[in-house]
Structure formats: C-alpha cells, structure tokens
Amino acid sequence: MQAAIKGRNVVVVGTQWGDEGKGKLVDWLTESAQGVVRFQGGHNAGHTLVINGVKTALHLIPSGIMRPGVKCYIGNGVVLSAAKLFEEIEGLEKAGVEVRSRLRISEACPLILPFHAALDVAREAAREHGGSEKIGTTGRGIGPAYEDKVARRALRVQDLKHPERFAAKLKELLALHNHVLKSFLHSGSFQFGSALQPYLKDGEVQFDAVYQEAMRHAELLKPMIADVSRELNEAHKAGANLLFEGAQGTLLDVDHGTYPYVTSSNCVAGNAAAGSGVGPGLLHYVLGITKAYCTRVGGGPFPTELEWEKPGTPGYHMSTIGAEKGVTTGRSRRCGWFDAALLKRSAQVNGLTGLCITKLDVLDGLEELKLCVGYELDGERIDILPMGAEEIARCVPVYETLAGWSDSTVGVTQYDSLPANARRYLERIAEVTAVPIAMISTSPDRDHTIMMQHPYAAQ
C-alpha cells in the first residue's frame, strides 16, 4: 500500500441507516492509525469484526481495540453505560485482549443509569399502547440519557470523582424520573422488566442501589478517565494518525435523518469534532461506508424496500445471504435495492471524500440489480432524498436496471479480478453519487478488502 501521511486523521461514517460494516473497515484502517475515537452514540451501536475466522461484537469500545498497541478513546459525545462497558471489557479480556491500559474515557461523557433504559422501554410501549408507530429504539436508554444532557441535568463521568456531588444530583434526577415512570405504570402500558428489579422497591427506582453500583464503577473507571480532548490534540501534534469511528448511520442522525425515526445523536462527520473535542480542521478525510444494497432496522420510511421475507425474491436473497440480523438487538433488518439518491444526501451532509462499498459478495448470483437514481414525489422528479419522514414515505423510486453476475466475488482483493458486471455496478454508483470509490469489502474477513485509494495516503 501507499505510505501513510504522518499526522493524518480519517473519519468513518455510515451513509445509510447503520449496519453498513463500519467495524471491519475501522479495524482494517487502524493498521495505519495510532488512536481510534468513538464520538457519539452509546451501546446501541453494534460493530462485528471477523479476524482470522473469529467473530467479535463490540458495542461501546472502539473497534481499534483489536489492534495491539492502538489507543482507544471514548469522546464526550458518547453516552456511557458503565455497567455495559465493563461487560464488554471483561469479554475482551477473556479473549486475551488488553483493554484497560489502552482505553481513555472523557470525563464529560453523560452517564446512562438503570432508569434510563426503563424510560426508553416505557415510551416505546406507550406509543404502541396509544396506537402510534414505534420509533424502533434499542431500549438501551440512549435517548433518555441524551435528553438529560440537553436539559443540563445529566450526571457525567466527572461527577463520579465527587461522591457527595454525585449523590445530590442523583437524588434530583431520581425524583424526576420516578415520577415519570409511575405515570407509565399507572397507565397500564408498561411493566418494569427483570433487568430493573435489583434497583426497585415499592414501585420506585431506589437511590441506594443506583448510587452504590455507581460508586463501584467509579473506582474501576478512575484509571481510564481522561481529558480526551487534550490527549487527542497532543497526539495529533506529535504526529499520530487518528481514526474517528462513527456509529449508526447518516439517515439515523437526529438532524439529517428520517426524523422522527432516528437516533438521539448526530451521526454525521461534523460531529467527530464536537463529540471528541478537536477542531474541524483536524478532520482530513471522510470515508463513507455503504452496503452494496440497503438495510434498515425498526420503523420509518425506506423507499427501496423489497419483500425480504418471501423465499426466491431478491430481498430474501439479501436477507439470508447477508445474514441481516442486528448485532445489538437481534432484530431482522429490512432489505432493499441500493439507493444512490439517498447516498447523494449523505455525501452532501458529510462532505464525503471517498466511499467504501461493503457486502458486494452478497449480490453474487442475482440475475439483475436495480439502482435507485431518484424519485417521483407528488408528481415531480427529484434526484436527492428529501428531508422529513412524511415526504420520504411518499417517494416512488426511479430505477435503473443493471445486469448481475454469477461468479463469486468472495475474498477478491484486486479490482480487476471482479466480474465485469460487478465493476459496472460499482462504477455506476460512483457516477450517480459523484463520490469516488476508495475501498470495497468482499467478505466480513479483515483481509478481504480491495483498496483503490488509501484514506491515510490520499493527498
């Protein structure tokens, strides 16, 4: 490969609705990086890595943890469940991965506490009980934790260093959230789940149980708590290459996604700066990860969605060959044709420098492929995804049809070795979206990657 440029930083973002295969590519690119940074989301994200045939699922810790010697950072834009963090750390340590000496956690991270997940589940249940469509959250407490952050009442990692301050803030927070949870209980739309039972007494989340667990976590977290903003800026000055790892995808961004069917954070590349504490001038290359087809978990509009549960259909082929089940929830992913008009929107809001196309091998064996190049919306032809779920739901895709291929692309590592029709499909995606293809993934394995332009070597 081309030699990496010293002091170069790359942002990796999903360009669809998440699940694009970012984890593998972050792991692959970390060969050229000295630090990997998570800058938004929480343990609702799910990244799967396959290294030497061994599968590892990560939800909170940056994917670079699988590369020995690489430092990993959890930035201020992440909402942190200490309980889930230590579950993940212990799982990695059992597999022989050194974590604690390499992981740095921003003291400004808001904490996810046990009642946040209960609020998340209660609200989804209330929507369903009231006849509304569910948002499709993971039920992990991400949204309620971000709400507390924006309302300026969140408990943050730095509060764990001050037990009296933490206790006072926790009491205020519990008074508010217990009141809300009681209203859901009385409505009959919600019951406390088993995970919350250890924290309950007389139908309320108890201060002592939450506080004592938090103080146990505080002792374990102390060696990893850091001024992540300062450390990242110092690392850059020293010539380190940094990789900023996005979670979820652009169409789940709270501002730019299919609102309200979105997550609670900004998933776009610009948030790599705000969510980690570096200036935007330090973001040198933005790599957009996109599947060779589209998938979505949960509710919300999906213009190119296919019948994916019926055997013998292209959608069923994508679902089964692509093993389209959520890493975090296990829910089946909805499947559909590639949407280049959607990708135009993602390219616009992220400022994409290059694309990485993943899961190309899943399309092997399909006789023909359809590529969405625009939509009919209320009698008008448009060539970019509109803003707003209601408008997107009314979009009728305009397709181009391309020939498929029968030869296997699994494990191909040279572009010229791909079937001619596969190359034409990729070239048409680049033409319609006006974004060059930098990388292509031809299986989940780390080494099954075609490199066109290395993000750390591009001028």
From Swiss-Prot:
Query: Would the keyword Magnesium be found if you checked this record's keyword annotation?
Result: yes
Identify the SMART domains for this entry.
Adenylsucc_synt (SM00788)
Cellular component (GO) terms are: cytoplasm
InterPro entries assigned:
Adenylosuccin_syn_GTP-bd, Adenylosuccin_syn_Lys_AS, Adenylosuccinate_synth_dom1, Adenylosuccinate_synth_dom2, Adenylosuccinate_synth_dom3, Adenylosuccinate_synthetase, P-loop_NTPase
Locations listed in the record: Cytoplasm
Query: Any idea which positions bind GTP?
Result: 18-24, 46-48, 333, 359-361, 441-443
- Write out the entry's keywords from A to Z: Cytoplasm, GTP-binding, Ligase, Magnesium, Metal-binding, Nucleotide-binding, Purine biosynthesis
Q: What's the EC number here?
A: 6.3.4.4
- Give me the comment on cofactor binding: Binds 1 Mg(2+) ion per subunit.
Q: Give the GO molecular function terms.
A: adenylosuccinate synthase activity; GTP binding; magnesium ion binding
Listed under GO biological process in this entry are: 'de novo' AMP biosynthetic process; IMP metabolic process
Indicate yes or no for the key word Metal-binding.
Answer: yes
Job of this protein: Plays an important role in the de novo pathway of purine nucleotide biosynthesis. Catalyzes the first committed step in the biosynthesis of AMP from IMP.
Alphabetized NCBIfam families for the sequence: PRK01117.1, purA
Q: What is this protein called?
A: Adenylosuccinate synthetase
What organism is recorded for this protein?
Paracidovorax citrulli (strain AAC00-1)
What's the encoding gene here? Answer: purA
